[in-house]
Amino acid sequence: VLIENWRRGSLEKLGLGYEALTKLNPGIVYCSITGFGPGEDEKRPGYDFLVQARGGIMGITGFPDGEPTKVGVAAADMVCGLQAAMATLAALYRRAETGKGTRIEVPLFESQLSWLANRAQEYLVSGEDVGRLGNAHPSIVPYQTFDASDKKIALAVGNDTQFENLCRAIGRPKLAEDERFAKNPDRVANREVLVAILQEEFSKKPADEWAEEIRDAGVPIGPVNTLADVFSDGHVLSSGILRDVDHPAAGKIKLLASPVLVDGERLPIRHPPPTLGQHTNEVENGEWL
């Protein structure tokens, strides 16, 4: 398997393109992560921030009265990497079945378009773009953050039954009987009125109190955490996803393990992050080639 992210055509100039290497190894799985796929910009480089902007994610992220905002991590890079990994695994399965290699290309820009998901399809079907909604959902209400008396909480009411349970939990059962709010389409149409009512209620108690009461009613709710909050969260600490690893330069460090569990066991961290140049000799001497 060869995975590369050079600009389109660069490795061909060095004699390391797919056509050259497949002659040496017909079973090679050759995966190129490019900036843009076939088209007028196919030779342009791509970066996460650029494709978040040009690909529409920034245009739908942020508050209506604020600036378009990038995602807090390099999400375009990461999703593209996941898609490249899935395509490579599929190619390995094909090779095991047929003995044939595969030429794969995963463009960063088109990969980002693919995770516009429901927002892309809504626009393609209706021709309408609802733009930036902050922490609200375009087609589900209430599904957003609210200000409790001490900090923000995130409420995700996914269906009408959960809305009824929410109304009982906050002491406003008649809201679920109000024709303006009884069904989700009604709540979407009357979003501003309902959100104002709920915000008034949520401001009366701290977030933790609301979370306990509303969770007990079977409604998804949780705090809006800082990183310090996240890594002191009881579930995070009990889940086994945080691991202590001995690093040759930094000593004992904490790392996040894989989220995947296999047969009930979380996958181990086999090696610490490499130091600069740690594997240069293995690569140059051909041990990895």
Give the label of every model feature segment:
Residues 1-23, 203:
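A structured beta-alpha segment of the ubiquitous adenosine-cofactor-binding alpha/beta core
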Residues 2, 27, 220:
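Residue-level detector of anion-binding/catalytic polar loops
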Residues 14-153, 157-158:
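Active-site-adjacent "lid/gating" segments in soluble enzymes
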Residues 133-138, 143-145, 155, 189, ...:
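Short Gly/Pro-enriched turn/cap motifs at secondary-structure boundaries
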Residues 141-217, 221:
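Aromatic-enriched alpha-helical interface/lid elements that frame and gate functional surfaces
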Residues 182, 246-289:
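Flexible, small-/acidic-enriched active-site or ligand-binding loops
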Residues 215-236:
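Conserved PLP cofactor-binding pocket of PLP-dependent enzymes
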